[in-house]
Every structure is written in structure tokens, then in C-alpha cells.
């Protein structure tokens, strides 16, 4: 995102998260805005790829989520791939496409596109989804799992973190 902004390209940092409050996974990508097309395009710098429809048109995350929800064609493409047959690409990249599908339940966009993170996100959950209920369920699960969770982190101070986590649930 920051490289694009430095080059004068409208860009935003986008996180996408799964439905389950027990799945702590999320993925962060960059979307760039094409002024001539008046459209956002998702680029994944982590995997060096993007998502396309059956015509090979690069999609935004919102477009990909909508298409996946309607069981329409979406596939992951590696930027270095020379394969033109999208059905072959789909079969080859099914696990990566499935990973995106799993995490495309909830989308968060930086409230302000800037250098560094502002910490403020705009949420784009599906209709009728309660972020508060999800957050409470996730916090309760983490509280339950704290002993196992904390073992992997030397800087995790239970005396400090547990009260904060309990407060978030209340």
C-alpha cells in the first residue's frame, strides 16, 4: 500500500477474516484504485497474486466475496503464471482460492490510507452479522484457552492480559 501511495496510486490496506470466532486467522492485502475504470483491484503482496473472474478480470475483495457467496467463478492467479486457461488455473490453485473463500467473510479497510497504520478500520460484514457478538465469543474462547495460548509467548503477562480480556467480554 505504502509503495503505491508514494507513487501517487490510490491504495488501501484490507484485512479479511473468517466467520468463526475460534479461528484467529486473517490475511492482509492491498487494493489499488484505477481511476479510469472507477474500480478497486486486489493485489496480494504476500502471495504475489490476485483474484479473477471467468473473463480474467481482476476483482476487488468485495466483488470476490459476492461472487463466492453466489457460487460464481473466482480463482487465484499467481502474478508470474503464464497459464491462460482459467479452468486449469482454478484446479491448480484450488487450495489458495479456498483459503481466500474461508477468510472472505468479514472485510476491514483502513479508515484512512496513509503511511503506517492508523489502527482505525471500517468494517464490511455481511448483512445481519453482529461484530459485537463475534468479538464476545472470540474473547470468551481466548479466555478459556489462555494457558495454552500464552505458553507460546514469553512476553504474555497473564496478570495484565486476563483482566483486559475479561473487560472486553463484559
Give, region by region, the residue ranges found by the protein language model:
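Short, solvent-exposed loop/turn segments at the edges of secondary structure
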Residues: 23-27
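His-Asp-centered catalytic microenvironments across diverse enzyme cores
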Residues: 20-22, 32-170
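Cysteine-centered nucleophilic/redox motifs
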Residues: 1-15, 30
